[in-house]
Amino acid sequence: MSTGPLVAGDALDRFRIVEAIGHGAFSDVYLAEQPDGRRVVIKVPHDALMGDVGAFDRFRREMEIAGKLDHPGIQHSFDGGEERSRPYLVLEYIDGITLREVERQAGRLPAPRAVDIASQLAAAMAHAHANGISHRDLKPENVLVTPEGRVVVTDFGIALMAGARRLTWRWLTSTMGTPDYMAPEQVEGKRGDARTDIYALGIMLFEMLAGRVPWEGDNPLAVMAQHVNAPLPSLREIDKHIPAPLEAIVTKCLRKNPDERYADAGELHADLERWQDLDLAAFTFGEDVVKRSVRDKGGLPLIVAGISAGFIGASALFVILYYVATHH
């Protein structure tokens, strides 16, 4: 049943629409109020999709996925329902801005800030992966950052749930995602899994550190081709002060072969936590990655220069010097 877009003052069940706040490929997003005045976000599929059984099933799957996830780093789902054959999803209202806006305001982020954001994202996605759910469209527009520094993943609209049947419909192609953040397997039309999310997280961490994505092009197809074929640019050639172990983490995330990436976000989160704690000896990125990251003659001084003395003591500095010396 087509009812047209909602406008301020409209009622949807017990919710009052305040304003439209987003228009995505598959749904409209509204700020709304409950009877007690609490603000929520309501997601409603486009009218144009309502006659498509596959689209309807996909939205219901998103509602099911939202109900399975309960983590401070994932936008919480309060409710869901249907009014006059129109399904809707009620989500937590988060007072924040997108990571894209953070990047616009700040440009390149300092390594500690970038790693903090990436670590929170990895922790959230570790929860999703542990529940058999892969996002498959992670990008700065789908990440909110609050004034207090909380980082929240949103929009599981094309997420994949383990064991679920494959849905196909006329609005959906096998190649789903956003070109700048698509893993090679997505470009090739494969479904993807947790390692696909790892790739997108790696792109976002690269972008926060470098101020740009690894690959750019005149059109989406040119960018997608580079994900499959082009070598990864060196972060430390862009900024020599980026520590080599941090570049190694990004490099592992962005392997072309999914089997060579972190298996899931839990592994990535552990390495990011170790970087924050400077526990280099416990990293999982592997000797070959470190050797490539520090093989230039200036590798050791650059690593040390990239880490503020205010964050480390003598023992941590010794670990860094010893690790690089024994793996150079």
PLM regions: where:
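Conserved N-lobe ATP-binding subsite of Hanks-type protein kinase domains
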Residues: D28
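AlphaC helix of the eukaryotic protein kinase fold
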Residues: H46-K68
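Activation segment of protein kinases
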Residues: V53, P147-P184, E188
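Activation-segment/catalytic-loop signature of the eukaryotic protein kinase fold
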Residues: G80
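Conserved short submotifs of the Hanks-type protein kinase catalytic core
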Residues: R84-T98, V102
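Activation segment signature within eukaryotic-like protein kinase domains
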Residues: I117-A118
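Protein kinase catalytic-loop region centered on the HRD/HxD motif
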Residues: A123-I133
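C-terminal lobe helix-coil module of Hanks-type protein kinase domains
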Residues: M125, T178-F283
